[in-house]
Amino acid sequence: MDDHIKELVFLLLGSDPSLPFSECESILDSNNIPFKEIKRLDQVLIISAPIDACKVVARQAGMVRRACILLAKCEKTPEHILRAVCDLDLNEILKTKTSFAVRVKGVRGHSRSLCIAELEKEIGARIKEAVKWARVDLEKPDALFFTVITNDTALFCLSVEEI
């Protein structure tokens, strides 16, 4: 198991307010994966745990849609999101990857004030500007940058597993 502890983000189904959170934590407990709950947001659980927790939860969960490594957390305005992206060492994050894609997902109407397609395009342009050798691949990217918009927060992540 990869023992590197990171903040991980799980995008959950929104059909029940508590069951997906319980399912995720039960899977971690039953597999003896040490974790610390950081925060619960609408359809999102943030924990501190080994990176391999993403794969374990993805393999066993029915109410988890995506498991990611949290790279940045900020206010949900485009300006704050783009600043957070630019503040990251994207060359280090993509050092073993040759291609990337960007997706933005708003949950429970928290992204109504945003133009998702434009935000994806802007984030992609900033990443491409910072990492000149990486190419955009919308079909089968080596790295998927996934931003979740929930409550008043944007969570900029590197996707590990999609269910």
Predicted region positions:
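Structural beta-strand/beta-sheet cores of well-ordered domains, especially the beta-sheet scaffolds
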Residues: 8, 98, 143-145, 152-154
